[in-house]
Amino acid sequence: MCFRSFGDRVNYWATFNEPNVAVIRGYRSGIYPPSRCCPSFGNCTAGDSTTEPFIAAHNVILSHSSAVHLYRTKYQKTQGGSIGIVMNCLWYEPFSNSLEDKLAVERALSFYMNWFLDPIILGKYPAEMKEILGDHLPAFSKDDMEKLKNGLDFIGINHYTSFYAKDCKFSTCEPKAGASKTEGLSLRIAQKDGLFIGEPSEVDWIYVYPQGMEKIITYIKDRYNNTPMFITENGYGYKEKPNFKREDLLNDVKRVDYMRSYLDAIATAVRKGADVRGYFAWSLLDNFEWISGYTERFGLYHVDYATLKRSARLSADWYRQFIANETKQCQSVFKEADVK
């Protein structure tokens, strides 16, 4: 219905936004609907965190494949659009220089992002997942695999932060995020030797590590034959401060620093050959942030929730000027090329 009704006006279609987050939080930790998990993973009334995430993910992958197949066979030729999927993409650094921790990075990436992208683009689950999970991974039929190969036109990358990955396959780990077999036996941690991987933000899961942006783009470029990419989400959050003055809430210097460093990292990846075609800041406005509700603010524009008044933050003015300056530079380069 969407292709038929809006295809003449929509150039880019995304079948899912962050399906890895939806599956992990809905069927492993249970903090998202339908809130299914084992007691060792969360507080749920029912569920199996060791099997259900993989069944749910498998169905997401197949439904993505069906949507892409429909679009390509019935609409793409006449409408001229592109179709892809948007993934939440974390970068990981090895906790140490050991081979075990370097392999833990590969498992962390495979059990979080490649879990979906490998079947959709390469037609099979990652080797790291097959080795650890075996028959717990659902199987694709021959028809599924044929449909899945090159099953998108672009990859949407939602990237905010990075972590360390520590081996739990050959070492003993405390039972935290990533350490279990169903998560890839790769402990996800933000600190090493008492230091965070990057400057902590007020939002407890964002650490400022712009190197991770360049590295995740380069990794995706190399693994998936430089499939076109869009940075579909990237941004910096502050905690809600109800007693602060309005002027202080608009002076978001740390957001400006974050955006500048991450945009520079994207530019570096592009100069090295990555086919990145667009960038979307999260977010234009303060908004309802899923399970965090109105307790976190990501907007370039401040929203007074009582009156709904919008006010430009420092970051909005900076980003407007950044785009204007980059546009002028590009126009200058094109003019020089025309003269030559």
Feature map (PLM): residue ranges:
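Active-site region of glycoside hydrolase catalytic domains
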Residues: 1-340
